[in-house]
Design a protein with these regions (language model features):
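Conserved C-terminal helix/tail region of periplasmic/extracytoplasmic solute-binding proteins
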Residues: 352-399
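Glycine-centered hinge/linker elements that transmit conformational signals in sensory
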Residues: 165, 206-236
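Hinge/lid segment of periplasmic solute-binding proteins
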Residues: 93-143, 153-165, 274, 341-351
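Long, aromatic- and glycine/proline-rich binding clefts that accommodate carbohydrate-like moieties
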Residues: 30, 126, 274, 322-371
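Extracytoplasmic/periplasmic substrate-recognition and gating elements
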Residues: 37, 54-59, 63, 132, ...
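Extracytoplasmic/periplasmic solute-binding protein
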Residues: 133-137, 142, 162-209, 251
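A structural signal for short loop-to-beta-strand junctions that line the ligand-binding cleft
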Residues: 86-87, 115-148, 175-178, 282-285, ...
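Conserved N-terminal structural module of periplasmic/extracytoplasmic solute-binding proteins
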Residues: 2-5, 15-18, 26-98, 112, ...
Length: 399
């Protein structure tokens, strides 16, 4: 504990009652010295994070507020640019290249002792232009989640799903429901046969070379469109619809990440987590996201944020508290991952991650998300052909 932290903590204790809040805020103030504000997405364990904040507040005198605004990754770009926003932001690492390029997150400088506590590949994901721009927290990859009472063994291939769906329809069930509205969920199929966002070359990315419009991507998207055309999937399925259908036993399978397990547990569904199906004999290729905690470049509390992240959250106890609220999946901290690795769900997450690829952490990824979202929605709804939609996507991403 630094003297600076103790002094700020004493002053804060004298002035106010400590509170730790969890809310979805609509008004965002400038960062305030002697108080930590944290943003994290609503599908993550924000209540658990708040509990870690309570411990920090109790021991240091620094109040911690945890907020989960909608579309926080976009709001942060706008708000942080004017010197406002949270002290700490949690999001997948791919956004942090853009944040760093725009000067919105601070470079971090953990010592070697701390660096060695985390898996090296997780640090690679948060390195931009040779600098570390965030703390890796968890390793996220999509998996196939299946209801063991509806199917004895999950399909190994995407090509098996239509026949399985036809059988399950006799029981008024669906084989599979997953979020078609966001390309993060549809990309594993589209990328399986050779699609890629941007070409990796010599430790960087060629932003003029995108594989969203190659033969493999077209084949994957066509298969998805055919699932909709043949009424095995509905074009309007979003995250909430898919989650509710699976958790109510109406769908035998869904595609989701570790953050979804807590709600499945509550539903009492007898479920398993396994490898995503192959397509044309090749593994589905999910993006591997590293849940990352970055420090706002405008924050007056950078040392407090470092203390919170290094000595409270990124510990066995801190991650266990967050994981208990909503599962983190695999984690960056070696010591806690060793504890978690016995869970077959986490073994499946790591296996899918090994088949996938680390999301590029370049600012152009925002173009990828927008372009591929439009391409998928326009094709499954019949508004565009596959060729036209992917031509447009490639043009938007490489202009």
């Amino acid at each position: 504990m630094t003297k600076k932290i103790l002094k700020v903590g004493t002053r804060t204790l004298m002035l106010s009652v400590l509170t730790t809040c969890v809310l979805s805020a609509s008004v965002f103030a400038k960062p305030e010295e002697g108080k930590l504000v944290i943003w994290i997405n609503g599908d993550k364990g924000y209540n658990g994070l708040a509990q870690v904040g309570e411990k920090f507040a109790k021991e240091t005198g620094i109040p911690v507020t945890v907020e989960h605004p909608d579309k926080l990754e976009e709001k942060y770009t706008q708000i942080a640019a004017s010197g406002d926003g949270p002290d700490i932001i949690f999001w997948a690492h791919d956004r942090f290249g853009g944040y760093a390029q725009s000067g919105l997150v601070a470079e971090i400088t953990p010592d070697k002792l701390f660096i060695d506590k985390l898996f090296p590949f997780t640090w690679d994901a948060v390195r931009y232009d040779g600098k570390l721009v965030g703390y890796p927290v968890a390793v996220e990859a999509l998996s196939l989640i299946y209801n063991k009472d509806l199917i004895k063994s999950p399909p190994k291939t995407w090509e098996e799903i239509p026949a399985l769906d036809n059988e399950l329809k006799k029981q008024n069930k669906s084989a599979l429901m997953f979020n078609l509205q966001e390309p993060y969920f549809t990309w594993p199929l589209i990328a399986a046969d050779g699609g890629y966002a941007y070409k990796a070359e010599n430790g960087t990315y060629n932003v003029k070379d995108s594989g969203v419009n190659n033969t493999g991507s077209k084949a994957g998207l066509k298969f998805l469109v055919d699932l909709v055309k043949n009424k095995h999937l509905n074009a309007d399925i979003d995250y909430s619809i898919a989650e509710a259908a699976f958790n109510k036993g109406k769908a035998a399978m869904t595609i989701n990440g570790p953050w979804a397990w807590a709600n499945v547990d509550k539903s009492k569904i007898n479920y398993g987590v396994t490898l995503l199906p192959t397509f044309k004999g090749k593994p589905s290729k999910p993006f591997v996201g590293i849940l990352t905690a970055g420090i706002n470049a405008a924050s007056p509390n950078k040392e407090l944020a470092k203390e919170f992240l290094e000595n409270y959250l990124l510990t066995n106890e801190g991650l266990a508290t967050m994981d208990k609220d909503k599962p983190l999946g695999a984690v960056a901290l070696k010591s806690y991952q060793e504890i978690l690795a016995k869970d077959p769900r986490i073994a499946a997450t790591m296996a899918n991650a090994q088949n996938g690829e680390i999301m590029p952490n370049i600012s152009q990824m925002s173009s990828f998300w927008y372009a591929m979202r439009s391409a998928v929605l326009n094709t499954v709804s019949g508004r565009q052909t596959i060729d036209a939609a992917l031509n447009d996507a490639e043009a938007r991403m490489t202009k």
